């Protein structure tokens, strides 16, 4: 049996993730108390279900504390067990709840939204370390759907997948980054008005950055560092290693370098390249992500 556990903060997109799994053929169960996991899995196994997706979150109350132990128990019941933890920055979660006017499950007359988010983050801290974390702070719902599908495809294979992720420091460092490189010291195409509308994937920006030797040295230095330490990360039984490349706005330099690194590692490894901030102007932080 294949089991995917979904957890994370309220408003981070758990309902979207669960619906993606349901759409691709998983039997989906939402808001299950953690203590009932073994019983449910045993029953579904007896009735012939081969793929199951279960959402477990803070609404489970005190039973949530049992989840780490239940995960260990489920490894004995499932041939393939994965856990996805969805996260987002506090300001993003506050904006999503404010825009949709949904109530946070831990908020009350005496507990503000910000306090409720912090309480939930504290309660889920140990669970966040159990699985693959996805920071949805800058993700549109359609992008999250694509990332979940990528995760399912990658996890079905053996070995480590290397993800290069560009971002803008002005929007915050991605919560799911394992390694972070700051490339704001490089020449900035933003100050050339002709280049400003483009991204680091467009030829005019590529030619601009290619003309500076320090850009090539930065790319090579990052490549060498990742290549040197990649075997150590792989020995840690990881499925993913997320390398985040940041510039000021996440549109030009970081995109260029993430693409460069992706090309140079793709001959020998499974590689994904993602750009968090390059299309930020079309990102919707509100209604479609504030699920519950």
UniProtKB/Swiss-Prot annotation:
Displays ATPase and GTPase activities. Pfam families: PapZ_C, RapZ-like_N. Belongs to the RapZ-like family. The keyword ATP-binding applies. GTP binds at residues 57-60. The keyword rRNA-binding does not apply. Keywords: ATP-binding, GTP-binding, Nucleotide-binding. ATP binds at residues 8-15. It comes from the Bacteria. This is Nucleotide-binding protein AZOSEA20610. GO terms for molecular function: ATP binding; GTP binding. InterPro entries: P-loop_NTPase, RapZ-like, RapZ-like_N, RapZ_C.
């Amino acid at each position: 049996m294949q089991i995917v556990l979904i957890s994370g903060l309220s408003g981070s997109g758990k309902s979207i993730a669960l619906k993606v799994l349901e759409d691709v053929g998983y039997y989906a169960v939402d808001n299950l108390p953690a203590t009932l996991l073994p019983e449910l899995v045993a029953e579904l196994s007896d009735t012939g279900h081969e793929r199951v997706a279960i959402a477990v979150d803070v609404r489970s109350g005190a039973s949530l504390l049992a989840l780490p132990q239940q995960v260990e128990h489920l490894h004995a019941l499932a041939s393939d067990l994965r856990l996805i933890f969805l996260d987002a920055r506090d300001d993003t979660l506050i904006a999503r709840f404010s825009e949709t006017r949904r109530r946070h499950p831990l908020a009350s007359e005496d507990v503000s939204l910000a306090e409720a988010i912090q309480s939930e983050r504290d309660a889920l801290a140990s669970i966040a370390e159990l699985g693959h974390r996805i920071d949805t702070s800058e993700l549109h719902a359609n992008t999250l759907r694509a990332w979940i599908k990528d995760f399912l495809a990658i996890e079905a294979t053996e070995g480590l997948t290397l993800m290069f992720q560009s971002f803008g420091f002005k929007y915050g460092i991605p919560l799911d980054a394992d390694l972070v490189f700051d490339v704001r010291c490089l020449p900035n195409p933003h100050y050339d008005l002709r280049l400003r509308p483009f991204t680091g994937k467009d030829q005019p920006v590529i030619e601009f950055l290619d003309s500076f030797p320090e850009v090539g040295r930065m790319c090579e230095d990052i490549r060498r560092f990742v290549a040197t330490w990649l075997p150590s990360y792989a020995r840690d039984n990881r499925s993913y290693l997320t390398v985040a490349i940041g510039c000021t706005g996440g549109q030009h330099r970081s995109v260029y370098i993430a693409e460069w690194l992706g090309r140079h590692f793709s001959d020998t490894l499974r590689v994904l390249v993602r750009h968090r901030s390059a299309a930020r102007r079309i990102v919707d932080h509100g209604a479609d992500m504030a699920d519950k």
